[in-house]
Amino acid sequence: MSGTGQQSVVCTIGTKVAWDDLKVFFFTLNLFNNSPPTVYLLCDTETKSRIEKDKENIYKGTLNIQDTLESYASMNRQIMERTKGKRYKTLWEDFMMEKATVLEWAFKDGAKSAFFFDSDITFFSTLPEVPANVKLALSPHFIKPVDELRYGHYNAGFVWTADPTMPEKWRSAAERSRYYDQAALEELRFNEPTTYEFPVQVNYGWWRMFQGTESPDVLKSKWTIFRNEQIPSVGLRIEGKPLNSVHTHWGEKRDPVTKTFNLWLLQQIQKISNHPKAASFARFIVREFKLQ
């Protein structure tokens, strides 16, 4: 593999509703990158103000911000799903496709390639590498086929592209999608023969553990501790390879599956108390979210 992914810029979106997620997002980008990547963020005015007041402590890399998401700022997903959209059926679908907007901004600003990450991504290493000569990289859910039929084969919160026309292709595909921006990625994959799929160690979400084709206990058994990685890591491996990133809301208080996943993962990390980055991350999560 080349270092293509690690040379890419990072794009994300988030309003004040996602502030807890953004704190973890930036903290872990700082923790596992000696030179944190350039980030493009679309947000609301409150989020922009909070970041600008404490930028040096929030993010060490270059951070470009546009507060163009004010119309979504006071609403959660449930409200947006009940609100009529402008381009799409619901406002939630409009909001999801702001992912394409932030990618377009990065390309217009001169980026050669870009990741889009949901703001609830937690990084446990440097950005994943992407093979040379690839234009699109996607993250499979690795869930049961029956769930894929509903939610899509790929997760829309972890996408890489080197194609400046991809954002508009994504918007167009979303108009025909059975599940928002997410199942739309299958159309992009069908039309892009060079697509790369990220492995299971990348973008690991609760759904991968609890909606997988194997039982949660079997999937947990594939996780191991390995303290002496030669790359920046949190000291955990899946199927013998370093854990790169997870996809979760650390501040979730109501959903029992997310809470179970978070507590289990934190417990694995706390077992590695002599691993500096693992210890730093665990302290941060316990302090911010009172998890034990």
Feature locations, PLM:
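N-terminal anchoring/stem segment of glycosyltransferases
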Residues: 1-82, 108-111, 265, 273-292
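Short, solvent-exposed loop/turn segments at secondary-structure junctions
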Residues: 16-18, 46-48, 121-123, 142-145, ...
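A structural signal for well-ordered alpha-helical segments within the folded catalytic domains
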Residues: 20-23, 97-101, 179-187
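Short, charged, surface-exposed secondary-structure boundary motifs
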Residues: 22-23, 27, 68-78, 145-154, ...
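Charged, glycine/proline-rich intrinsically disordered loops and linkers
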Residues: 64-91, 210-232
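GT-A fold catalytic core of metal-dependent nucleotide-sugar glycosyltransferases
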Residues: 94-148
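Conserved catalytic core of nucleotide-sugar-dependent glycosyltransferases
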Residues: 124-188
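Catalytic core and acceptor-binding pocket of nucleotide-sugar-dependent glycosyltransferases
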Residues: 161-261
